[in-house]
Amino acid sequence: MKPVRRALISVSDKNGILEFAKSLTAMDVVILSTGGTYKVLSEAGLPVTEVSEYTGFPEMMDGRVKTLHPKIHGGLLGRRGTDDAVMAEHGIDPIDMVVVNLYPFEATVAKPDCSLEDAIENIDIGGPTMLRSAAKNHKDVAVVTDPHDYARILEEMESNDGQLSHATRFDLAIKTFEQTARYDGAISNYFGTMFSDDKDDTFPRTYNTQFVKKQSMRYGENPHQSAAFYTERNPTEASISTAKQLQGKALSFNNIADTDAALELVKTFEETACVIVKHANPCGVSIGENVFESYDRAYKTDPTSAFGGIIAFNRALDQETAQAIIDRQFVEVIIAPNVSEDAKNVIAAKQNVRLLVCGDLGIQEPAYDYKRVTGGLLVQDRDLGSVTEDELKVVTKRAPSEKEMADLQFAWKVAKYVKSNAIVYVKDGMTIGVGAGQMSRVYSAKIAGIKAADEGLEVPGSVMASDAFFPFRDGIDAAAEAGITAVIHPGGSMRDQEVIDAADEHGIAMVFTGMRHFKH
């Protein structure tokens, strides 16, 4: 392990670089630099040599060629103790550290007015080449790509006579290969959606993405399966990926999946709402005048299934609600935008309960959804589709009342998050019964009715939502028999008129959404 004696610095993100370079200079590190970075350092009075002066070869082609030179890459790739004679013969000095971050390609192409020419000029060539050279030779060279690493690198060098341990250099090399892979993947994705005839495709012909391991797990969906939790590099939306755990055991694979399902549903409500999920399906959902009422009503939908469930709120958890949860049921996870101190103290009595805060919910952001199949991957837009009351089409002789319309819209939101075939019964802003995951839509409806009856909830006067159209009138006949007064579903069946006629016969109001919400 030898001290760093020569460093090459060339960065697009100049945050912290001046202070970092000053500290290197104080440790007698010779600094080489290029372009804008050279200007920043030299104007600050730091001793710095421009790369063109060092190589004896000028920057050219508007800066496209700056560091692609044997004196640079020989200094990075040269193996100390093995290539010394060759380096000396050609006048190549070792470069012990590279500090490089890349042209902002991803930020550039994310701009709505980005042209192809703008994108091309933000493809870094010299930067990734230096990074890969240095990372390959990490045994002798430290490679720094992230300004957040400056402090720890300086601290280690200052306490070790200018040296960095092999463990640190190895970690920095891994980080570098991760970054160059992500960078090349972003470029590939961007160009992969284009064709030479100026036509674009929504999805690239080769899809590249990168996730960062957040948590290792004891096991996966089942104890015989290994698992880990990966997140996007910089997720911004309030989510299970950004949530902070305040107490409780480590989240399991199933905890994370179920908490995600609960939180994403509760986000869709503007009113104070609570969602209880079991095995990725909502078993109780309600809005209320306050947090306690929303929980109380959601719990009453199906207390049996709520046992061992996940509870999500879209308002801060208060003491009264926390106490009710602890007194009533065994719960795996509670997640809310915030938690009062009194509520924290209540939950603390049950140390195994996982308590999470996710911050202000904001809006659900467009993204991709993935489904793994053997030998492949299905990629689609995230289902953020919704309909307003004005977009609903009343297709029956009787239009829904104001109260029915409010319940229909509530039920439609819930149905979107229930596994298909999905049937949801709702009354007064509360789920009465949920039928999920059945091969027959009629059987999902029967299950919703059975669940309601088991909990002593009255179906008559409820509305019904179906995630897809009714292919036959039997579903409407069954709904009428149960006492359903209004139905919401996508429509679009060959037998729509038959289904509408059945609703009219029973005096049921029916609206079409024109949008399906299958969930598998």
Curated annotation (Swiss-Prot):
Q: Which molecular function term from Gene Ontology is one that the record holds? A: IMP cyclohydrolase activity
The MGS-like domain sits at 1-145
Going by the UniProt record, its keywords in alphabetical order are: Hydrolase, Multifunctional enzyme, Purine biosynthesis, Transferase
**CDD domains referenced in this protein's UniProt entry, alphabetically:** IMPCH
Residues crossing the lipid bilayer are none
Q: Which reaction does it catalyse?
A: (6R)-10-formyltetrahydrofolate + 5-amino-1-(5-phospho-beta-D-ribosyl)imidazole-4-carboxamide = 5-formamido-1-(5-phospho-D-ribosyl)imidazole-4-carboxamide + (6S)-5,6,7,8-tetrahydrofolate; IMP + H2O = 5-formamido-1-(5-phospho-D-ribosyl)imidazole-4-carboxamide
Pathway(s):
Purine metabolism; IMP biosynthesis via de novo pathway; 5-formamido-1-(5-phospho-D-ribosyl)imidazole-4-carboxamide from 5-amino-1-(5-phospho-D-ribosyl)imidazole-4-carboxamide (10-formyl THF route): step 1/1; Purine metabolism; IMP biosynthesis via de novo pathway; IMP from 5-formamido-1-(5-phospho-D-ribosyl)imidazole-4-carboxamide: step 1/1
Tell me, what is an example of a GO biological process annotation in this record? 'de novo' IMP biosynthetic process
Q: Name one GO cellular component term.
A: cytosol
| Keyword set includes Protease | no
Q: Which InterPro entries match?
A: AICAR_Tfase_dup_dom_sf, Cytidine_deaminase-like, MGS-like_dom, MGS-like_dom_sf, PurH-like
Pfam families from the xrefs? Answer: AICARFT_IMPCHas, MGS
| Domain-level remarks | The IMP cyclohydrolase activity resides in the N-terminal region.
Q: Which HAMAP family match?
A: PurH
Give the record's family classification.
Belongs to the PurH family.
Instruction: Tell me the protein's name.
Output: Bifunctional purine biosynthesis protein PurH
Tell me what organism the protein belongs to.
Hydrogenovibrio crunogenus (strain DSM 25203 / XCL-2) (Thiomicrospira crunogena)
